[in-house]
Amino acid sequence: MHGSAAPSSRTLLVGSGKIAARLAPQFLENGEVYALRRSDSPPPAGAIGIRADLAAPLAARLPAVDRMLVTLPPGDTPAAYRTALTHLAAALPAIPARTVFVSSTGVFDGSGSARPITERDQPGPTSMRSRGLLDGERAAVEIFDATIVRPAGIYGPGREYLLRTVRAGVAVEHARRTNRIHETDLVRTLEMLLRMPEPPRLLHAVDESPAPLGDVVTFIARELGVAVPPDIASAEPGGFVYDGTLVRSMLGRLDYPTYREGYAAMIAGSAA
């Protein structure tokens, strides 16, 4: 009599948004995937759904897993992430061998800086949101020994805020420093961090081309064939510049190395 083979790996996706939905198939190829979410919406195809609200202790135990990706939205208080992660750890039978916690470059706030920010720079958060993000990072490291990923300006199909802004002709601060990463490259980054033997402990997920917002909206406007949005002039440009050397050394060439390739593909896709 032959028993069914045990799965080679078990992956838990905490917060099942678009990123998790794109990652699930990669890990279903050689194991089971669990998708924990607060709502009762269906999990990614093939994944096992778990409905739970991490704002409170979980009523049932979670399955043992080998790896875990945490992509949770900001909470209402600076302690929301720590609370959620504490409840998550209490419901797991053991700490996973690998945890990746998705934070944001939003841990850096304030007036901004033209000097490239690397993973060695320490955030000095001033807002409730940025303080909550930083405390979430610290909790993820303390509780799960997690790798921290800080994406900047995630964009791609379905993430079209800037395209809508340009189409509507809404004024923007042209001199503002901006950074971004295409969703496809972020998914690649997260998959590699979940799989590689010795991942970096902290990673800024940004593309190769930090740029003034005016350059980006001008490119988009020309691709769309519309007027460039008006400028909101400012005495001191805001925003930061993030150094993406580490993520590029890990991934090699990005699928969308700059905003030009990314937005051109989005515009071409929407016109098809």
Predicted regions and their residues:
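C-terminal amphipathic/interface module of NAD(P)-dependent oxidoreductases
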Residues: 195, 228, 235-272
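Catalytic helix-loop patch of NAD(P)-dependent Rossmann-fold dehydrogenases
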Residues: 112-148, 172
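Substrate-positioning beta->alpha
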Residues: 161-163, 172-194
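Conserved Rossmann-fold NAD(P)-dependent oxidoreductase catalytic core, especially the SDR/UDP-sugar
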Residues: 87-126
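NAD(P)-cofactor binding segment of oxidoreductase domains
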Residues: 61-101, 135
